[in-house]
C-alpha cells in the first residue's frame, strides 16, 4: 500500500528476516499462552509456503489479500478476485478452510460496506478490518463497539473483531498495535490494557 514499494519485484530485493522473526513470535506466543490469527498476504504464502504451513499447525490462518492493495483502491470485481485468489492459495498450502480476513491498512471504510458482502460470498465468517477511528488508509470512526460484535450489510451478518480503542475527549484513540506500541507511553499501554478485562486485541505487522 506504499507507492515506493508497491511491486513484487521490489519486495524481492529486501533482506529476508521472516524466519528469525517468526521464531521469535512463535516463542512469545507459546511462553504467554496467547491465541493468534495470522493474516497472510498471498505473496508471502507463494514465497514462503513452509512458514505458512508452520503457522497453520498451531494457529488460525486468515487472508490479507494477495498483494496488500487497499480495498478502496479496487473495484468490487477486482477486490473479489484478489481475495478469492489469496484464499485459494492459502487453502491449497495449509489444507484448511480460510474463514478469517483483515483488510490491508484497515481500508474498509463506511463507503466500502460492499466488501463484507463479497467476503461473506467467499466463505469468510470472521473479519478484523474495522479500525474504529480515523486512519491514513481508511478507518470507521463511527463504529462504536469496542468488543466483538456483528457487522451487517445487505442482509448479511459477519462476526467482527474490531481494533481496541479508548474514548478520550470524545475521540476514539487506538493504542493496542502497530506503530501505537511505539508512540503510546508504556505506562499508558499497561494501564489501558488492564482496563480491558473483557476483550483485548493486539496486532503487529
Provide a role label for each language-model segment:
Residues 173-187:
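Binuclear metal-dependent hydrolase catalytic cores centered on His/Asp/Glu-rich metal-binding motifs
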Residues 1-169, 184-205:
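Catalytic alpha-helical scaffold of carbohydrate-active enzymes acting on polysaccharides/glycoconjugates
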Amino acid at each position: 500500500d506504499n507507492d515506493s514499494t508497491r511491486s513484487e519485484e521490489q519486495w524481492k530485493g529486501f533482506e529476508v528476516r521472516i524466519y528469525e522473526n517468526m521464531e521469535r513470535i512463535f516463542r512469545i506466543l507459546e511462553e504467554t499462552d496467547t491465541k493468534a490469527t495470522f493474516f497472510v498476504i498471498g505473496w508471502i504464502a507463494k514465497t514462503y509456503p513452509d512458514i505458512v504451513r508452520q503457522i497453520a499447525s498451531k494457529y488460525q490462518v486468515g487472508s490479507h489479500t494477495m498483494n496488500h492493495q487497499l480495498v478502496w483502491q479496487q473495484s468490487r470485481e477486482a477486490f473479489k478476485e484478489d481475495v478469492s485468489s489469496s484464499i485459494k492459495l492459502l487453502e491449497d498450502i495449509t489444507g484448511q478452510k480460510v474463514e478469517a480476513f483483515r483488510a490491508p491498512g484497515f481500508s474498509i471504510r463506511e463507503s466500502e460496506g460492499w466488501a463484507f458482502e463479497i467476503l461473506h460470498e467467499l466463505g469468510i465468517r470472521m473479519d478484523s478490518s474495522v479500525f474504529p477511528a480515523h486512519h491514513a488508509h481508511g478507518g470507521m470512526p463511527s463504529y462504536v463497539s469496542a468488543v466483538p460484535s456483528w457487522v451487517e450489510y445487505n442482509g448479511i451478518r459477519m462476526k467482527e473483531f474490531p481494533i481496541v480503542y479508548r474514548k478520550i475527549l470524545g475521540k476514539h484513540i487506538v493504542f493496542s498495535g502497530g506503530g501505537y506500541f511505539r508512540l503510546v507511553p508504556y505506562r499508558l499501554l499497561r494501564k489501558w490494557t488492564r482496563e480491558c478485562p473483557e476483550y483485548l486485541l493486539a496486532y503487529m505487522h
